[in-house]
Structure formats: structure tokens, C-alpha cells
């Protein structure tokens, strides 16, 4: 697939989710929430609260952006040292696993439940008929009960580290591409570093800044493609 097609899809997906994020930042759609979890008669509780409309609107972005970004990184990695490029790409692919699991988890909850109907007693429901009524939901909730292995937490924890490592590796990749194309090298490395910092140290509305950075990177690549000629072709065909 041509770079122009890939980057255009990334740009449209990011512009779309930026609009969605701005809408929900203003409070749009937050009057209807889904609350799933448990509370114990002996103390303690665990809940997950989601906005169904946001989950459904975010789904097309998740599919489109991560698919085409993976294709984009696959093109970028071949222009540097094979070991570095492959390591960065593998780390990126590993980081997608928790994103996929969380997306399926969120879609399952908002499509199966309404309001707070599934915020129920641990002893009187989830540890009895809840196990058979909603086995997938119990699998997710049980990881947060007592001393059980919190596999969801571990998955997200190591997934975040893989994502940070992938961004760091690709920051180096883009920095090495500076000699071949200054605009791509600077824009790519900057977006990777900003993504690392705002993921490690979240700020209010930091995700808006990340969206804007990716839009800037896509715009820079499309601009360089437009300038490309037979004599001076762009580094990414």
C-alpha cells in the first residue's frame, strides 16, 4: 500500500478522534453511563464506568488508526538498521495487545449492560449465579477480587512499558532518518518523544496534544510526498 494512502487514513482517523474528544470534553453524551463492578459486604469494591456513546464513536478510530499506523511503521523501519527497526516494530505490535483486549472489554460492557444494573454484590451475585450468567465478565472482575492475580492490571502495565519502549525506539529511528529527510526526521522524532512524555506523565487534555502531534506528522509526510519528484524522491514511497 502506498504511503500516501496510509498516511491519509491516519490523518482522517486522528482528525476524527480529535473532534470526538473535543465533543466529550465539553460534556457531550456523559448523561448516560454504564457502571459494572462489585461491592463486598465485608468492605471493598471495584467498578468500571464507561460512556457508551464515546466507546462506539471511538471504535472506528481504534481500528483505523492502529491498523494504518502499523503499516506506516512497517515502511519506516526498513530504512534503518535491521535490528533496531525490527525491535521497534515488535515492541509496537506487543503494545497493541492490551489495546485490543481493552477495546473488546469496553464494547462488551456497553453492548451488554445499561446504567448500573451490573454493579452488584460480590457474595450474593458475582460469586454465585454471576459466574454462569456472565462468565466473560466474571473473568475480568475476578482479577480484582482479594489476592487473585490481577491479569488485566499486569497486561496494561507491561503493555504501557512496551508502548513507551516502542515510541523511544521509533524516536531513534526517525532521528536516524534525519540525514535522508530532515522534515520526516524532526517531525517523527518529536511526535514520538511527546507521545512518550504525555503517556508517562498524563496531563489534563494531554490526549488532545497527542492527537495534534500526530496530525502534524501526517501533514508533514503528505507535504513531503507532494514535493517528491523523480530526481528527489521521498524516502517513503
Question: What are these model-derived regions, one by one?
Answer:
Residues 2-236:
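Hydrophobic, aromatic-enriched alpha-helical segments typical of multi-pass transmembrane helices
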Amino acid at each position: 500500500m502506498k504511503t500516501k494512502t496510509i498516511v491519509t487514513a491516519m490523518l482522517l482517523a486522528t482528525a476524527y478522534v480529535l473532534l470526538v474528544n473535543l465533543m466529550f470534553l465539553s460534556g457531550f453524551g456523559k448523561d448516560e453511563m454504564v457502571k459494572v463492578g462489585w461491592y463486598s459486604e465485608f468492605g471493598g469494591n471495584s467498578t468500571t464506568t464507561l460512556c457508551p456513546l464515546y466507546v462506539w464513536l471511538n471504535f472506528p478510530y481504534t481500528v483505523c488508526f492502529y491498523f494504518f499506523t502499523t503499516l506506516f511503521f512497517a515502511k519506516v523501519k526498513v530504512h534503518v538498521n535491521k535490528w533496531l527497526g525490527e525491535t521497534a516494530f515488535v515492541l509496537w505490535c506487543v503494545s497493541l495487545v492490551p489495546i485490543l483486549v481493552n477495546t473488546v472489554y469496553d464494547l462488551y460492557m456497553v453492548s451488554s449492560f445499561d446504567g448500573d444494573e451490573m454493579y452488584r454484590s460480590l457474595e450474593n451475585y458475582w460469586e454465585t449465579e454471576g459466574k454462569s450468567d456472565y462468565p466473560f465478565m466474571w473473568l475480568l472482575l475476578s482479577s480484582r477480587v482479594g489476592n487473585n492475580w490481577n491479569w488485566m492490571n499486569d497486561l496494561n502495565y507491561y503493555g504501557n512499558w512496551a508502548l513507551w519502549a516502542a515510541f523511544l525506539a521509533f524516536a531513534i529511528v526517525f532521528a536516524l532518518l534525519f540525514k535522508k529527510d530532515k522534515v520526516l526526521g524532526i517531525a517523527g522524532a518529536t511526535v514520538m518523544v511527546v507521545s512518550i512524555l504525555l503517556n508517562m506523565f498524563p496531563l489534563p487534555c494531554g490526549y488532545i496534544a497527542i492527537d495534534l502531534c500526530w496530525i502534524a506528522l501526517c501533514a508533514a509526510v503528505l507535504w513531503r510526498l507532494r514535493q517528491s519528484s523523480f530526481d528527489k524522491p521521498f524516502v517513503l514511497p
